[in-house]
């Protein structure tokens, strides 16, 4: 199949059928005889079209009000290749797009031409600095921009948007069971130290996944929030650890970098995908000391037979960290679900709190920047549970050196003799 047609089909699956970006690429490359040298080009074009989707959608639909999905996606391919990728045959891209247009419609090549000559993508009638302008410029839903602007102010909201438009830094967790920080940095100059022990930033030029330190299992990608959260919490496996998570995550990576053996752990996966992700991770590392259940927040009490010393809660959230990581996440984000998510986060915390022993710890982590899901949830919890005290909380912004959009809170339950 021709690369421009394949790119169109992949985009159609993502935009129209709501197939996730990575899965759509995987399916296309598996089921189609695509030359290896063409795959990076197709991936880049699809990603680029998604990264500029909101403004391109506006321009295409303004020029072609009655265009159907096939024509719209074909124009996305032609537009993205002409302006950014420039690797596919542009005449073939234009011809494919034009085949879906009406006779009276402007030709695809004529539609694209002004932008090749310097015409700005954001329409002139959009006020510079307005929410719509920022949405088109940074490919972010207006609802998210308004929320950040209200919660953090214009300057911080703009910094978040600018950071999200750039690739996320590669933050790594050093496996200190295998190598000390000092030896690691002495042996591998492609990594930069962090103020937090056991954490590094990849600054090498080659692909991180192909680095010898990765192949040896000495380091793995992991957001800084995991390490700092667990540093603040008191995890004593002999006294019990419980985990409730509603999405696939890398918490086990952090635990494996700390403990030689993982035992006496109850892991409740709130979704099937989290359950499978966890089971696969346990099999990969041959871990036997973790019991895994597929259970929602209401079932926590049935999975944890007695109070534990530490309970880590990782409920679903708006997951706005993914705006920087996944080019198609903005298509799936729905701000109307925010109240439902917050109610569920509170439910998970309340249920877990009942299973924390006196003097124990309750840890909360979400991968999003949203005050209502961050400090808002924690403050409401503390009002209802005076027996808990906030030890530390921290919000991570993507414009910081080690990046990421995360929030964690560490709470301690009052002991009987406190």
Language model: regions and residue ranges:
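S-adenosylmethionine
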Residues: 1-418
């Amino acid at each position: 199949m021709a690369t421009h047609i394949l790119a169109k089909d992949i985009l159609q699956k993502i935009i129209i059928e709501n197939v996730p970006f990575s899965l759509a690429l995987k399916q296309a490359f598996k089921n189609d005889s695509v030359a290896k040298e063409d795959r990076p080009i197709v991936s880049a074009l699809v990603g680029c079209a998604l990264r500029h989707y909101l403004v391109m959608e506006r321009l295409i639909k303004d020029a072609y009000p009655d265009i159907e999905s096939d024509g719209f996606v074909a124009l996305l391919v032609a537009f993205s290749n002409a302006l950014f990728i420039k690797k596919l045959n542009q005449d073939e891209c234009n011809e494919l797009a034009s085949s879906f247009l009406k006779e009276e419609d402007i030709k695809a090549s004529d539609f694209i031409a002004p932008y090749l000559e310097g015409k700005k993508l954001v329409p002139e009638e959009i006020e510079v600095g307005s929410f719509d302008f920022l949405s088109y410029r940074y490919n972010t839903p207006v609802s998210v921009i308004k929320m950040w602007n209200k919660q953090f102010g214009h300057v911080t909201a703009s910094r978040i948007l600018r950071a999200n438009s750039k690739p996320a830094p590669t933050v790594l967790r050093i496996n200190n069971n295998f190598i000390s920080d000092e030896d690691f940095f002495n042996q591998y100059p492609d990594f930069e130290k962090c103020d937090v022990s056991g954490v590094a930033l990849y600054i090498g030029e080659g692909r991180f996944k192909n680095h010898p330190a990765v192949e040896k299992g000495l380091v793995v990608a992991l957001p800084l929030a995991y390490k700092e959260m667990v540093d603040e919490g008191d995890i004593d496996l002999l006294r019990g650890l419980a985990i409730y998570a509603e999405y696939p995550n890398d918490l086990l990576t952090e635990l494996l970098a700390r403990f030689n053996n993982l035992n006496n752990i109850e892991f409740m996966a709130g979704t099937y995908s989290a359950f499978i992700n966890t089971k696969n991770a346990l099999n990969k590392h041959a871990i036997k000391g973790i019991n895994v259940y597929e259970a929602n927040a209401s079932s926590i009490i049935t999975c944890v037979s007695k109070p534990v010393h530490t309970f880590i809660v990782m409920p679903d959230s708006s997951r706005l960290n993914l705006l920087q990581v996944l080019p198609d996440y903005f298509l799936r984000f729905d701000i109307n679900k925010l109240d439902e998510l917050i109610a569920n986060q509170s439910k998970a915390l309340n249920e877990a709190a009942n299973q924390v022993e006196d003097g124990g710890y309750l840890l909360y982590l979400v991968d999003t920047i949203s005050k209502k899901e961050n400090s808002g949830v924690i403050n409401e919890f503390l009002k209802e549970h005076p027996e808990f005290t906030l030890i530390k909380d921290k919000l991570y912004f993507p414009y910081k050196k080690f990046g990421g959009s995360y929030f964690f809170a560490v709470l301690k339950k009052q002991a009987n003799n406190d």
